[in-house]
Structure formats: C-alpha cells, structure tokens
Amino acid sequence: MSTTVLPPPDKKAEYVERMFSRIAPGYDTMNGIITLGLDREWRATTVALAAPPSCGRALDIGTGTGDFLVELTAWMPDGLAVGVDFTVPMMRAGLPKIRDRRAVFVAGDALKLPFADESFDAITTGFTLRNVTDIAAAFREMWRVARVGATVACLEVARPRHPLLRAGHWFYFQRIVPLMARALGADPEAYTYLPQSARIFPPPEELAQIMRAAGWSDVTYRLVGLGAAAIHTGIKRG
C-alpha cells in the first residue's frame, strides 16, 4: 500500500498550487501519456456538450495550460474564451497555445471567481474539481457567473463499474502512473497525489447531486474511457 500524499483540507489549496507550479513545464506531455491520448477526445466532447455560442463568452475553470481554450475558440470564431486558474506557471506554459486566438488567461480562484454575475454563455472545467477544497462552492460560483440558459460541462475522473476494469484502473493509476512519472523524470509525489485524489473523488451520481443542490438544472452525465472519466452537464434556468 503506497503512503498517502494527500494534504489535510486546510493545506490543500497551498499544496495544489505549489504542486502544479512544479509540474507545469511537463504537464501536457504527462497528461497525454497517462490518458493514452484520450484526453483530447474527452475535451472535444465536453466543449461540444457545453455548446458555446459562436459570438458569446465562455469560461474554463482550472484552465491549466489552456487546452480547453483551444477547443472553445474553435467553436467561437467571434467570441471570447476566458481561462481562469490560480497557478500562474501553468497558464504561462500555455501562452503559446492561445497566441492568435480569441482567448485570455486570468488568475483567480474557482471558489471566488473574479467575474460579475451572469457573465458567461458557457462554462467548462476539466480534471479540476478534485483539487478544490469545496466542490459544492465551486458549482455555486459557476452558477453565479453563468447567464440564464448557459450550460456547464464538467470532465472529471470516475471509476469503471465493471469489477475487472475497476481493478485494472486502480492498478494502472495507483501503481503504474507513479512509476511512469519516475521513469520520465516527472515529479513522483505529484503523480502519486493525482491518482490518490481521484480515488476519493465523489462518484458520478453523487457529483450530479452536488450540481443540482448548487442550482443547476437538467443535470446528466455520460461515462467515457470505459468509465474512467465522466462528463456532467447542467443548465442554468431562470
């Protein structure tokens, strides 16, 4: 059994910010390797479900190096995609991606977004919520800055339902991923934290209930990657 690296709740935000600052230079490469390249397809599906209007404004929360901004700007040739994150080195690493695109990075906290009420026509977030200290508060903030009729689409980790797939998923993320990180010269603690944080993340139906309690309507989800991830959507009704 591997030793836990999960921080106590009152230290989590600081821990996460420092961790992502350390791994920012190699984050995209490792993310692609860990997900076997499927993360690109999952992001494209998430943005399609959010369906941002071509001339509207979309927000990506926990944007990291801006992969979602690339997808959003493809949908919004006359709009603006805004990515918010509290880890500045991650956004700095992503600046080349958004050059010549209608997109901007903004430093900010998912639990206290630096935007006015009803500012955005669509909201996306990917692999972010397991790193926040209060998932319900994050969804309430998303609801606050969303315009009436806006869709939120959330890509997050899940655990396969089939026992064999579930066992294989556990072994891969708990054992293989940290070894891969060491072999590739990546931060071993960070790539131990990531699977450990995924393991305690709420399952899809529980996450859907959290979204509903935060005010989102018509909440649903679909599993992708043989159940290794889930995409939740909700709509802000008037």
UniProtKB/Swiss-Prot annotation:
PROSITE patterns: SAM_MT_UBIE (PS51608). Keywords: Menaquinone biosynthesis, Methyltransferase, S-adenosyl-L-methionine, Transferase. Pathway: Quinol/quinone metabolism; menaquinone biosynthesis; menaquinol from 1,4-dihydroxy-2-naphthoate: step 2/2. It is an enzyme of class 2 (transferase). Disulfide bonds: none annotated. GO terms for molecular function: demethylmenaquinone methyltransferase activity. S-adenosyl-L-methionine binds at residues 65, 85, 109-110. The keyword Transmembrane does not apply. Its EC number is 2.1.1.163. It catalyses: a 2-demethylmenaquinol + S-adenosyl-L-methionine = a menaquinol + S-adenosyl-L-homocysteine + H(+). Pfam families: Ubie_methyltran (PF01209). Methyltransferase required for the conversion of demethylmenaquinol (DMKH2) to menaquinol (MKH2). Belongs to the class I-like SAM-binding methyltransferase superfamily. MenG/UbiE family. PANTHER family: 2-METHOXY-6-POLYPRENYL-1,4-BENZOQUINOL METHYLASE, MITOCHONDRIAL (PTHR43591:SF24), METHYLTRANSFERASE (PTHR43591). This is Demethylmenaquinone methyltransferase. It comes from Roseiflexus sp. (strain RS-1). The gene is menG.
